Swiss-Prot record:
<keyword id="KW-0961">Cell wall biogenesis/degradation</keyword>
<dbReference type="GO" id="GO:0071555">
    <property type="term" value="P:cell wall organization"/>
</dbReference>
<feature type="glycosylation site" description="N-linked (GlcNAc...) asparagine">
    <location>
        <position position="353"/>
    </location>
</feature>
<keyword id="KW-0325">Glycoprotein</keyword>
<keyword id="KW-0677">Repeat</keyword>
<keyword id="KW-1015">Disulfide bond</keyword>
<feature type="glycosylation site" description="N-linked (GlcNAc...) asparagine">
    <location>
        <position position="252"/>
    </location>
</feature>
<dbReference type="GO" id="GO:0045490">
    <property type="term" value="P:pectin catabolic process"/>
</dbReference>
<feature type="disulfide bond">
    <location>
        <begin position="246"/>
        <end position="263"/>
    </location>
</feature>
<keyword id="KW-0326">Glycosidase</keyword>
<feature type="glycosylation site" description="N-linked (GlcNAc...) asparagine">
    <location>
        <position position="93"/>
    </location>
</feature>
<feature type="glycosylation site" description="N-linked (GlcNAc...) asparagine">
    <location>
        <position position="198"/>
    </location>
</feature>
<feature type="glycosylation site" description="N-linked (GlcNAc...) asparagine">
    <location>
        <position position="328"/>
    </location>
</feature>
<comment type="similarity">
    <text>Belongs to the glycosyl hydrolase 28 family.</text>
</comment>
<dbReference type="InterPro" id="IPR011050">
    <property type="entry name" value="Pectin_lyase_fold/virulence"/>
</dbReference>
<feature type="glycosylation site" description="N-linked (GlcNAc...) asparagine">
    <location>
        <position position="112"/>
    </location>
</feature>
<feature type="disulfide bond">
    <location>
        <begin position="391"/>
        <end position="397"/>
    </location>
</feature>
Amino acid sequence: MRLTHVLSHTLGLLALGATAEAFSRSREAACSPKKPFRPLPTSSSRDKTCHVRSHGDGSDDSDYILSALHQCNHGGKVVFDEDKEYIIGTALNMTFLKNIDLEVLGTILFTNDTDYWQANSFKQGFQNATTFFQLGGEDVNMYGGGTINGNGQVWYDLYAEDDLILRPILMGIIGLNGGTIGPLKLRYSPQYYHFVANSSNVLFDGIDISGYSKSDNEAKNTDGWDTYRSNNIVIQNSVINNGDDCVSFKPNSTNILVQNLHCNGSHGISVGSLGQYKDEVDIVENVYVYNISMFNASDMARIKVWPGTPSALSADLQGGGGSGSVKNITYDTALIDNVDWAIEITQCYGQKNTTLCNEYPSSLTISDVHIKNFRGTTSGSEDPYVGTIVCSSPDTCSDIYTSNINVTSPDGTNDFVCDNVDESLLSVNCTATSD
């Protein structure tokens, strides 16, 4: 990956912006500059403290962790002490929590027992998502600036041998209503870094994500965040170095604010993929993405929808035929460098045969999309094109707007591929179709 002066300058700015202020009980006040779609509840005060014990010899500390959580639940704070390492070798269901803080000052490390985790991690019922733990309940905060390490290298190597293995997600936020996550350092997740499911009113603030493979086997599917069946989520002030979506809004994600992120090496900030499962209805609406720097990536703004016919992106990712809608999506203010597509909208996800895709157009509509205030330079890999907006039918896309898109290829071109979309609403230079 090339490091430009633009990237260096932006990283310097992001280093200041991505460090969350001291933990605040007022989640609403912590959100800046944009405010969430709906007010976030304030966290109640805590009146007792429990310190988690550690064996200190590499043994599983899960029982100590559960003991502290039960002891300080309903109004306390659980502390993972600085300069201590806590080993987790047991799948932990922590969805019983209420009015509790987890202050992570030290390091939490998951074991590399791949057989155990494949058999015992929590199956989340979407794609192949499984999680090391489930953190949920009401008014739960996890912060402190410490490190959570997923021991991912063994998983990267194993996945290269068998792409059907179940790789755990590092942070399973499942059924949480009211919470603040961060600041934290997340390292070497086997798969996604966050899976946020059936949750609401959660703020992620000051998350530092990194974890590249140390072998020839890539760290794949390491999304920064995937939201699923969740509402009123804020993700802000974070730095993400990964190998897949920086943030992905999965089915039935609503009222999501993402702001002040630096994403490096990713697949962009993505709506979807959606419409993967036949006879299921997927909805993503009311999403605002603001002030993003995106470097060394495949995309910046991305909307990916499966067509109306079965398709296969890979052996472990197949689908098509679902219905639903994408509505009221805004991408506002982005700086890009070495990104393949500044904008990529497709209703043919997983289907390389455009003719077949058009014969079986997606049943999932895209409308009321606003993309504005982009600047920077693409990678040139799609030269002369810098973006693509391809719908499977003019009946399935409407009210897609772009404005102030100042993005060029390294050769100075700024062409777009446009299909089945109202070009009069686009400020970009549509010069080709996907045929």
